[in-house]
């Protein structure tokens, strides 16, 4: 659902997430705020809220157990979202995570995939994903630490020159605290349905999930405690609007979260039934 103001910010209290894991709780595209699929609230609501984000209720807030399987696309046994967010090319997207544990250091990566038709009926593993943003380790600091310092939020720009259409946006954090073991890297992916408008024509080449990440990739099988001086972010280089070249966006950590500092303490109670009534008008419905 789309909330009418930042006061709907539904980041869960830290006590809700006793385990050291996390999910995206909210997404903002420019000034439009959407509550994400909430794994510990939505399954017990009646009716279950419709979201723009794909749900993975059975997986909780933990990582994908095996990133060589289809679970790496949109998380474990992900189910298609009912709603679609209308987003302009060139918009700023801000992802708000639940309280992220400091020990879970690693990169952040975001991809887009053109669904061709309706993203709500597509097999996400059949799509081609092009990276639009990533950030990792720079000047001795992990991007995950910057995200924590910015109210557990991260911002990036939707490429302004991509062709309009229906897209999945795939956003993930990768925790590397156990990545010294094979399959020890912890991926936390999620997907959301977008309808991107604009006058662009770019259709960048992409990669497949699963397949884009290998067990022995330098940025996946790595010991971050062993004198790390540099880090290679997994996957391709990000598409840079207008040129097709890469663009490391480590500086894109969101400061927007500071606009509503009190909202970070808002519990799931903020997701009152009345807000659910606004969802049909706030996002594209199944009829769109």
Swiss-Prot record:
One of its GO terms (molecular function) is metal ion binding. Binds 1 copper ion per subunit. Cu(2+) binds at residues 21, 104, 188. It catalyses: [(1->4)-beta-D-glucosyl]n+m + reduced acceptor + O2 = 4-dehydro-beta-D-glucosyl-[(1->4)-beta-D-glucosyl]n-1 + [(1->4)-beta-D-glucosyl]m + acceptor + H2O. One of its GO terms (biological process) is cellulose catabolic process. Residues 1-22 form the signal peptide. Its cofactor is Cu(2+). Transmembrane segments: none annotated. It holds the Pfam family AA9. Disulfide bonds join 74-191, 115-119. GO terms for cellular component: extracellular region. Coiled coil: none annotated. Glycans are attached at residue 151. Lignocellulose is the most abundant polymeric composite on Earth and is a recalcitrant but promising renewable substrate for industrial biotechnology applications. Together with cellobiose dehydrogenases (CDHs) an enzymatic system capable of oxidative cellulose cleavage is formed, which increases the efficiency of cellulases and put LPMOs at focus of biofuel research. O2 binds at residues 177, 186. Residues 249-270 have a biased composition (Low complexity). Keywords: Carbohydrate metabolism, Cellulose degradation, Copper, Disulfide bond, Glycoprotein, Metal-binding, Monooxygenase, Oxidoreductase, Polysaccharide degradation, Secreted, Signal. It is found in: Secreted. Its EC number is 1.14.99.56. Residues 236-270 are annotated as: Disordered. InterPro entries: AA9, AA9_LPMO. Gene3D superfamilies: 2.70.50.70. Lytic polysaccharide monooxygenase (LPMO) that depolymerizes crystalline and amorphous polysaccharides via the oxidation of scissile alpha- or beta-(1-4)-glycosidic bonds, yielding C1 and C4 oxidation products. Catalysis by LPMOs requires the reduction of the active-site copper from Cu(II) to Cu(I) by a reducing agent and H(2)O(2) or O(2) as a cosubstrate. Active on cellulose and on xyloglucan for deconstruction of plant biomass. Belongs to the polysaccharide monooxygenase AA9 family. This is AA9 family lytic polysaccharide monooxygenase A. It comes from Geotrichum candidum (Oospora lactis).
